[in-house]
From Swiss-Prot:
Protein name: Kinesin-like protein KIN-UA
GO BP annotation list: cytoskeleton-dependent intracellular transport; microtubule-based movement
Signal peptide start-end: none
Coiled-coil regions listed in the entry: 415-644
Native organism: Oryza sativa subsp. japonica
Keywords: ATP-binding, Coiled coil, Cytoplasm, Cytoskeleton, Microtubule, Motor protein, Nucleotide-binding, Repeat
Gene: KINUA
Cellular component, GO, one term: kinesin complex
Domain of life assignment: Eukaryota
UniProt subcellular location: Cytoplasm, Cytoskeleton
Organism phylogeny: Eukaryota, Viridiplantae, Streptophyta, Embryophyta, Tracheophyta
Recorded family membership: Belongs to the TRAFAC class myosin-kinesin ATPase superfamily. Kinesin family. Ungrouped subfamily.
GO molecular function, one term: ATP binding
Length: 945
């Protein structure tokens, strides 16, 4: 928006030292604020339990806007009220050429500081903290036209180097995070006319602000929450928001924001509790979760561009713009009150006074890391606005936040995960049961098939056995037949053997006969060969029959052994193996079913424990919230009681201030007409407040930045000062200094009136009179008298000065500090009660002065005459009420006792007044004093003659 005429800062990059804690150079470091309780959790800690926390002070930087066209138009006549010392992190605020004050901040940016350096010093530490899981806030505050929107909301479309904190923060976050596992979403809102509106969805207006009763976290449930895709998407969303934001043209800024802009960046990052970490879980739940417990880091970053405070006479706002300015100033005032209360460690922080303070509740005094950049202009024409902005930053530096990481177990997702696992295991168990039943049926089927096969095998075996037996019988019969054949062959062989023997014998005989019958040789040889061949064939056939018989015997033995083995195998081994396999399968399924049932029981137990833990945690949080609400109600009741008591006591303030200097104890301000019983009751209430609250706490309220608190506190002090027993305590505790400081700094008429009354009561004591004068009390009272025309305030001031006039040691100082002139000057009001106090003061002064002169401690004309009081007395001695006339007559008579005053009395016509007093005065002592003066002074006697 700065590109459209908003105030801007020239980007010149400079590198400074890292920021350090700072405060005003003439004061000590800001006091630490005690951390407030918060439902969030810090590392290291359990998923849902609060752990340790870190205290972090609000970091404040100041940025000076360059001269704008209006400043440059003055040329050499331009008067700057700001002098920067960036290297010392200081700035000097010049009220005039001889008076200036120095302030220290965490960082001071000159008009040449670049946008990049401002981001790295102010916002980058907060963004990095948000990425670690902490909440964070970056906020710009300052007068309209000093460059807040340029610093925070500049998009930098034409020149990326001019990009503001919003763009740079989102660019930083997107460069670090992984959008696959993490998520980034933004909401862009504006607070316009005390109504929260959505800049990304303009139709959404008057969005409610909701506070979580358990954690106290503030949320805006009706606001649009847009998931970020990339940097280009970011620019589109920010441009849409800027176009929908309200702005107007004023004398101080051509594009003045008319609403507070709030960019909320929601970050969610996944995390896990690793083995061996210091993370602890609730008692009794250590074994319920896996080793790596899924966690979620949730954090949010608020970047706030506040609308500038403005004065109608300077901005030139008209019509509806006046209404806008009123709401802007009201919300900024509420924010200032909260900052003041936090800086002063007030027990009550008025965050509910406006929607802005409700939204920023966590940013100041809460659990967020906060950086504030205040922007100022150089022109002395806006000195008061610049001073107010600087003091706002100084007070913010005193605030200490307790930052916490919001790291928690997502019990809902964990419950869903466990429930899903239970369902999965249940279905798995059912599937396994079905599978078991199916396999059991299959095994039973296989068993039946095996039994059938076994039966078939038995039948087959029996048949084979029968066949083998039949074959055996056949073989046996064959063997028997072969044996018979063999026997026959043996018989034949025996016969043949016998024949061979016979033939051999015959051969021998034939050999013998061969010689005898050569002719028969061939026949014999052929017959021999034929017989030999036949013998060989018979021998071979015999061997074959023997071999066949042995083979048949072996085959028969093998078949018998196979039959026996088959019977044993099928009857024992196969059946036993099937039974073992069936038993083993049954045991495995039973074991699996038992394991699944135990796992399901454990998961159900885990589910019940998680539910009970959640329920117990909710009950504890509800009890804590009820206890906290009770304490807050009790505090509000006590504060209301204190305010009511203070209000009642303030009504009796004027009636409790007494006169002094030996003129009696008649109250010089009392015209209330209240009864003694009411006064006694009021004093009893004051004593009760004094005992319950304590004087130091009451005096501390005098320094409060809230006007109503100051008024009530000074009324209580004034009433306490009306009692002699309390005056010494008030002075010892610094009450006199606080009252004088309040009289000097405050511009409120009520505070002036009551403070002057309190000082008048303290001035009843002689020792207090000297302290009041030495601390410049008379000068301050005279200053108030010259600035106000309020009769009641002037009555209080005149009463205080009248009491001081009763101390002769202070007369010279009273004259030098303008006290006598102030008394005489208050006659201009014409108010009878004011004039009565003036006359009482003159009487006190003249009486004490006369006593000192008569004792020889002083000579010369009266100081009253030197200030022109005599002429006033002569002219007005008979113009007022009886009591006022008595005081004037008494003062006149005491002045007449000093012979050095005779000439002035004669010249002013005072002889006639003395003669009148000596005859007509209502008091005998006054008439006697007048006669004494006339008779004892030769000059008077001569004048009478």
């Amino acid at each position: 928006m700065a590109a459209n005429g908003r105030a801007s800062v020239r980007p010149v990059e400079r590198h400074g030292a890292p920021p350090r804690p700072a405060g005003r150079s003439r004061s000590v470091a800001p006091p630490s604020r005690r951390p407030s309780p918060s439902p969030s959790r810090a590392r290291p800690a359990a998923a849902d339990n609060d752990g340790g926390s870190d205290s972090c002070r609000v970091r404040v930087a100041v940025r000076l806007r360059p001269k704008n066209s209006e400043d440059l138009a003055h040329g050499a006549d331009f008067d700057s009220c700001v002098e920067l010392q960036p290297e010392c992190k200081k700035l000097k605020l010049k009220k005039n050429n001889w008076s200036c004050e120095s302030y220290r901040f965490d960082e001071v940016f000159s008009e040449n500081a670049s946008q990049k350096r401002v981001y790295e010093v102010v916002a980058k530490p907060v963004v990095e903290s948000v990425l670690e899981g902490y909440n964070g806030t970056v906020m710009a505050y300052g007068q309209t036209g000093t460059g807040k929107t340029y610093t925070v909301g500049r998009l930098g479309n034409d020149d990326p180097s001019e990009g503001g904190i919003m763009v740079r923060a989102l660019e930083h976050i997107l460069s670090v995070m992984s959008l696959e596992t993490d998520s980034v979403a933004i909401s862009f809102l504006q607070l316009y006319l005390e109504s929260v509106q959505d800049l990304l969805a303009p139709e959404k207006t008057n969005i409610p602000i909701v506070e979580d009763p358990k954690t106290g976290e503030v949320s805006l449930p009706g606001a649009a929450k847009v998931e970020i895709r990339d940097l280009e998407h970011v620019f589109q969303l920010l441009q849409i928001g800027e176009m929908n934001r309200h702005a107007a043209n004023t004398k101080m800024n051509t594009e003045s924001s008319r609403s507070h802009a709030i960019l909320i960046i929601h970050i969610q990052r996944s995390s896990r509790i690793e083995d061996g970490s210091n993370t602890s879980l609730p008692n009794g739940t250590d074994n319920l979760f896996p080793d790596n417990l899924p966690l979620v880091l949730k954090s949010k970053l608020l970047i706030v561009d506040l609308a500038g405070s403005e004065r109608i006479d300077k901005s030139g706002s008209e019509g509806h713009m006046i209404e806008e300015a009123k709401f802007i100033n009201l919300s900024l005032t509420s924010l200032g009150k909260c900052i003041n209360a936090l800086a002063e460690n007030s027990p009550h922080i008025p965050t509910r006074d406006s929607k802005l303070t409700r939204i920023l509740r966590d940013s100041f005094g809460g659990t967020a890391r906060t950086s504030l950049i205040v922007t100022i202009g150089p022109s002395s024409r806006h000195f008061s606005e610049t001073s107010s902005t600087i003091m706002f930053g100084q007070r913010a530096m005193k605030i200490v936040n307790t930052i916490r990481i919001k790291e928690e177990v997502d019990y809902e997702s964990l419950y869903k995960k466990v429930e899903h696992e239970v369902d999965h295991l249940t279905s798995e168990m059912e599937r396994q049961q079905k599978l078991k039943n199916s396999e059991k049926m299959q095994l039973e089927k296989k068993l039946k098939e095996s039994e059938a096969s076994l039966n078939d095998l038995k039948v087959t075996s029996n048949m084979q056995i029968e066949n083998m037996a039949m074959e055996k019988r056949q073989l046996e019969s064959t063997i028997k037949r072969l044996m018979l054949d063999l026997e026959k062959e043996k018989g034949k062989n025996n016969i043949l053997s016998e024949q061979i023997i016979h033939l051999e014998t015959s051969l021998d005989e034939n050999k013998q006969k061969q010689l005898e019958n050569i002719s028969n040789t061939n026949i014999l040889a052929d017959t021999t060969k034929s017989h030999e061949k036949k013998i060989r064939e018979l021998l071979k056939q015999l061997e074959d029959e023997r071999s066949r018989s042995a083979s048949m015997n072996d085959h028969l033995n093998v078949l018998q052994q196979q039959l026996s083995d088959a019977q044993n195998y099928f009857q024992k081994n196969i059946a036993c193996e099937l039974e073992k396999q069936l038993s083993r399968t049954t045991e495995e399924f039973a074991s699996q079913i038992s394991s699944l049932e135990e796992r399901i029981a454990d998961l159900i137990s885990e589910k019940e424990l998680v539910y009970e833990e959640l329920k117990s945690t909710q009950e504890k949080m509800q009890q804590e919230m009820r206890h906290r609400q009770g304490l807050e109600d009790e505090i509000l009741r006590l504060k209301q009681s204190l305010a009511d008591n203070c209000s009642e006591e303030s009504k009796a303030l004027c009636g409790m201030v007494r006169s002094g200097s030996g003129l009696g104890s008649v109250p010089f301000m009392s015209k209330s007409g209240k009864s003694r019983e009411l006064l006694s009751s009021q004093r009893s209430n004051i004593s009760k407040i004094f005992e319950e609250v304590g004087l130091p706490n009451v005096l501390a309220l005098l320094k409060s930045d809230e006007l109503e608190v100051q008024i009530h506190a000074v009324k209580v002090v004034a009433n306490l000062a009306a009692e002699d027993v309390n005056q010494e305590k008030i002075v010892e505790e610094g009450g006199l200094d606080a009252l004088l400081s309040l009289l000097e700094t405050s511009e409120n008429t009520t505070i002036h009136r009551v403070t002057a009354g309190a000082i008048a009561n303290l001035a009843m004591n002689g020792s207090n009179q000297g302290l009041i004068m030495n601390k410049g009390g008379a000068r301050l009272l005279a200053n108030i008298a010259s600035k106000t025309n309020d009769p009641q305030t002037l009555r209080m001031v005149a009463g205080a000065l009248a009491n001081l006039c009763g101390n002769e040691k202070l007369h010279v100082m009273l004259k030098q500090d303008g006290g006598i002139k102030a008394l005489l000057g208050m006659f201009r009001t014409g108010h009878n009660e004011v004039i009565a106090q003036i006359a009482r003061g003159m009487a006190n002064f003249a009486k004490c002065e006369s006593r000192v002169i008569s004792q020889g401690h002083r000579k010369g004309r009266s100081l009253l005459i030197e200030e022109g009081v005599l002429n006033w007395m002569v002219a007005n001695s008979s113009a007022f009420s009886a009591s006022t006339r008595r005081h004037i007559e008494l003062a006149f008579c005491h002045l007449a006792q000093n012979e050095d005053n005779a000439r002035d009395i004669i010249l002013t016509g005072g002889i006639k007044e003395l003669l009148r007093i000596s005859r007509e005065s209502s008091r005998d002592d006054t008439r006697n004093l007048a006669k004494k003066a006339l008779n004892s002074n030769p000059a008077f006697f001569k004048e009478i003659q």
